[in-house]
Every structure is written in C-alpha cells, then in structure tokens.
Curated annotation (Swiss-Prot):
Gene: cdh
InterPro entries: CDP-diacylglyc_Pase (IPR003763), HIT-like_sf (IPR036265)
Enzyme class: hydrolase
Species name: Mycobacterium leprae (strain TN)
Major site of localization recorded for this protein: membrane
Annotated protein name in UniProt: Probable CDP-diacylglycerol pyrophosphatase
Protein origin, superkingdom: Bacteria
The organism's taxonomic lineage, starting at the top: Bacteria, Bacillati, Actinomycetota, Actinomycetes, Mycobacteriales
Keywords, ordered alphabetically: Cell membrane, Hydrolase, Lipid biosynthesis, Lipid metabolism, Membrane, Phospholipid biosynthesis, Phospholipid metabolism, Transmembrane, Transmembrane helix
Length: 268
C-alpha cells in the first residue's frame, strides 16, 4: 500500500499543475509504462519552468530555476512539505549514463542546498538531521526525469539512524538493521566531499561491484552528525522495487512532534 501511495503522489501533483485529470496522470504498472505520462514532469520543468523563465523571468510553475546550477526546484502540491530537485537537462533517472560524467552537476548536493525550502514551511524549526533526500529507481517511480525528493525523514528511520556511528562507515557497509524491511548499504561522506563531488559515480561503482544495475538502485542521503552525511543505497531487482522515498514522511510528523515538545517546555 505504501509503495502505491508513493507511485501516485508525483503524478497527482503533475496533474494538478497541467490541468490533466488524475486518471490521465496516474502511472501504468512499472513494467508497462506510458511514455506520455512518464514524460509529464520533464515537460513541466523544460517547457514551462525553464522556457518560461527565459522568456518572462518568472519561475512558475516551479519554485526556482537556477540556470547556473542547471536545476529547478518544484513544489509537490500533493504533499504539504515535499520539494523535488530536477535537472534542466534531460536526465531520465538514477540509471542515466549522464550522471557518470565527470562534468555532471552535483545534483545531490544541490538538493541538500535547497533544504531551507522544506524547513521554511515548518516555521524554520526543522533540524538538519530531520531533512532527508531520496531517489527512487526506475521501477518504483512514475516519471522519467531525475527528481530528488527533499522532505522530512520518517520518525522510524530517524530513530534507526541515530544509532549509527558514522566513523564505522568509511567504506561501504550494510546497516545493522533493515529500513522498511530492506537492506541498505551505507557510506559516510563529509560535508566537503559532499559539496565538491558528485556521488553518483561512487554509487555506480558499488552497485556494479555487487553484480547489480543502476536501474534498480534506490538512493538516500541523511545528515547524521555535524558535517557528516550517510549515503544510503538499496539494490533491488526487476521484480522487487525498493523506493527510498519510503524512508521519508511528507507530513513531517517529526517536526510536529518537536514543536509539541517545545510548546510543553515553554509552558513549564
């Protein structure tokens, strides 16, 4: 059920912006994709956001267009706090060879740099470790334009990651417990490395060394200590899709819980 909600959410947001009906935008089964539907997000970011910005200077329907960085930021209307970071270039997804080029923009860090947009929707009360990035694989997404989900971490995921000692992950190593019943490999990355290089080459090296393909790789990034991040990769199969977005909570209940705790302390 959770995966079905994830697959539909982006399509519903697109339908709201394009004026299409939900039925028209709802994805086909992953093994029988509708090309027209799966290109909807690309058409929005290219035809409307980028070209519109070039002609009028306005970002709409995106929140931001950054031609220098080669990215756009798109508010997912169907979810209250989620944003999507998208390339302005045609990049289909995590499996696209363009992400392996040395000159490829640092999309993951650009997504992290946009975290303030999520926090601002929560009165700027969200600590950085509560913000979480996720990329779904080809068979667990509805759109064939790379989009990085920027949202809140789920409380369950947060509790597990609090127990992780980043110093133990200087090389790839599986987390000691599963996340949403899936095994994730983890690699610690400091802020300087995260900011200065694209991590997609490291991800592909790991995935291919394990005998798997990027088509089925699911990726997430968490901030687990000051200036320390954890790169997470789950390797699914054609028959078993793993969506890293499952580790997020677009309702941001973790922020509401924090706000409630602060209110209680204020009353004391």
């Amino acid at each position: 059920m959770r995966r079905s909600i994830i697959l539909v959410s982006v399509s519903v947001a697109i339908a709201m912006l394009t004026g299409a009906s939900i039925a028209e935008a709802e994805p086909m089964p992953p093994n029988n994709p509708s090309a027209a539907t799966r290109d909807a997000l690309w058409k929005i970011v290219h035809d409307r956001c980028e070209l519109g910005y070039q002609h009028t200077g306005a970002y709409a329907p995106c929140t931001l267009v950054d031609e220098q960085a080669g990215t756009a930021l798109f508010k997912a209307n169907y979810d209250p706090n989620q944003y999507l970071l998208l390339p302005l270039a045609r990049v289909t997804g995590i499996e696209d060879p363009a992400l392996q080029e040395l000159a490829s923009p640092n999309y993951l860090y650009n997504a992290w740099a946009a975290r303030g947009f999520v926090s601002s929707r929560l009165n700027n009360s969200l600590p950085e470790p509560d913000i979480f990035l996720a990329i779904n694989p080809k068979n667990a997404r509805t759109q064939d334009q790379l989009h990085i989900h920027i949202s809140c971490v789920s409380p369950t995921t947060a509790e597990i990651l609090k127990q992780v000692n980043w110093a133990e992950y200087v090389g790839w190593k599986p987390l000691p417990v599963t996340l949403q019943d899936h095994t994730y490999q983890a690699l610690a990355v400091n802020r300087s490395t995260f900011e200065s290089k694209s991590l997609f080459r490291d991800i592909q090296t790991k995935v291919t060394a394990d005998g798997n393909t990027m088509d089925h790789a699911s990726v997430a990034v968490a901030n687990i200590a000051p200036d320390q991040f954890l790169l997470l990769v789950a390797e699914g199969t054609e028959d078993q899709a793993i969506a890293a977005e499952e580790l997020q909570d677009h309702n941001c209940s973790i922020a509401k819980r924090l706000t409630g705790q602060l209110d209680m302390e204020t009353r004391r």
